[in-house]
């Protein structure tokens, strides 16, 4: 029962061939068996899950269910939900029980979705391996010696391991797309402002965006329909008419113009990634799409620009964690200033501290113009590059990551780890939508994904193209043993 896609489970629930309680119970049993080794979930509450499932069954019986009623979903630990611990995988918030619910979570609860639990992540979403968690690393379900990617590694791992039909992630510099690639699932980062950020703990406010993660593009489209929408509680939420993100699922690929950025197809990619890209290019050509070479010249500069800006925003956002009102507080201190220092030294992990220090430095007097202001100018140039390309094509095809998932504990420097985000970061700098879908496997049997990038508000077109690729391939149907 846990092998169904979201769409398949929805059909069975609506036709009463299975009940929401049966479906939730099957997932809870699978989680109890497999999660201790995987470490994808860090909070489970069976009583709450089954209570939501019973309510969903009542709604289905009364005939007022939606396509998502009774479908279980996992939430990255960054989303607040009343009565659930929302720790952001940090010691700082290990004892924080949320008193309110994020708008995007509430939207899914209103549809009758059933909460399975909270998934592991890099602390405060800072990282791309899921090793920076207070609760320990999540394993890649395809090979437990490898990372699942990050920061939404727990969400990607539980969907790939069939411990959830769908999950929510957040994407600041690739945190939905990169773990989706490493775990062999589909995930989309929508246009900035499409999904409310209210109740999603902030890392870098001008980059963060929530998105769905599932087995297929069709499942992601169904989820995004429920997730997206204007929210007056979020000042960056976009006031637009409600969209149907499933509307282009049946649009053929014939005639679609796909750009191939030459900067993304260079020597930095492993042979496995280039093979996955070629698989996708061959499929697109066979379906009648037109492929053209394009250029995104600021690609290499996107990494320093991103890490300056995101760290600056993080240092500001994380200043609220000081031990005064909630979260961890140092046990022994002499005065208020010492309490602040000890609390933050004890509560934050090393990567979070590193980014706070970088951010504080680039915002400090004498360095603001040299770093922060220059990075903002670069951000605009990156966005302009994309607009030049989208004048010539409908979508961009690119790698998601330069390699398949690295090993847990790989001896990489912070800079080497940051460089692995080279193909995802520019999308966040520009605020564009982008989706990752499975496109092959490495020689070692690890999944490899590719990325479809669209212009602002082109989610339906991206999802439609991804769905057509998945109708003509079976990479998304593969699952770990």
From Swiss-Prot:
Q: Which GO molecular-function terms appear in the entry?
A: ATP binding; glutaminyl-tRNA synthase (glutamine-hydrolyzing) activity
Family annotation (PROSITE patterns): AMIDASES
Q: What is its EC number?
A: 6.3.5.7
Active site at 76, 151, 175
- Alphabetical GO biological process terms: translation
Disulfide pairs here are none
Pfam family example for this protein?
A: Amidase
One GO CC annotation, please?
Answer: glutamyl-tRNA(Gln) amidotransferase complex
The protein's matches in SUPFAM superfamilies, at most eight in alphabetical order, are given as: Amidase signature (AS) enzymes (SSF75304)
Could you tell me what reaction this enzyme catalyses? L-glutamyl-tRNA(Gln) + L-glutamine + ATP + H2O = L-glutaminyl-tRNA(Gln) + L-glutamate + ADP + phosphate + H(+)
What UniProt keywords are attached to this protein's entry?
A: ATP-binding, Ligase, Nucleotide-binding, Protein biosynthesis
Q: Does the keyword ATP-binding apply?
A: yes
User: Which top class of enzyme applies to this chain?
Assistant: ligase
Give the quaternary structure. Answer: Heterotrimer of A, B and C subunits.
Family per similarity comment: Belongs to the amidase family. GatA subfamily.
Q: Which PANTHER family match?
A: GLUTAMYL-TRNA(GLN) AMIDOTRANSFERASE SUBUNIT A (PTHR11895:SF151), TRANSAMIDASE (PTHR11895)
Role summary: Allows the formation of correctly charged Gln-tRNA(Gln) through the transamidation of misacylated Glu-tRNA(Gln) in organisms which lack glutaminyl-tRNA synthetase. The reaction takes place in the presence of glutamine and ATP through an activated gamma-phospho-Glu-tRNA(Gln).
Name of the protein in question: Glutamyl-tRNA(Gln) amidotransferase subunit A
Q: Which organism is it from?
A: Neisseria meningitidis serogroup C (strain 053442)
Q: Which taxonomic lineage does the organism of this UniProt entry have?
A: Bacteria, Pseudomonadati, Pseudomonadota, Betaproteobacteria, Neisseriales
Task: Name the encoding gene, please.
Answer: gatA
